[in-house]
């Protein structure tokens, strides 16, 4: 006989920073395998790639992970995990003084976006008629942020350049032309962009806990790929 086709439930999510609602489905066995292999590698790039693959699969291809900022990847992944596996995740926390291990069960809905995701662009005027508009760097760029210098980060965060009514996007120019353009910008642009990058939204949950052995009060911020897998 023909193997049955299993109906999979779908649900809509209003992703922060995206106007339209996106339709998703929960993880399937194949996505769980992708995540398990990534978790076993303990390599942050593998975890990022796994999240991106799962998000693209579960959004029926509506989302391109390369267009998403890190906080959006994290936010979507947590919602997918809640719908697929459950609303809670167990962590083992350590005491900063005696290193005693403490079990902690977290409700994933306790994650909060810290930062202004509504203002996802910054306009920097170079003259009365000319300027650049920055966007939050994609997750793909942000995950390599520590490996990029200020010029490279700025280069990868330009949404478009305008002069009077004309608009030019980085995709219309060669990487060499864009690099030369950025290298010749006033130093004040780097300062303004640095302030913008400092306010990139992130997903965080602060946990205050007391050690069951020595009574020391501890605090930890749970965020990002360091804590997503487990």
Question: Over which residues does each language-model region extend?
Answer:
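Long C-terminal interaction/binding lobes of large macromolecular proteins
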Residues: 1-230
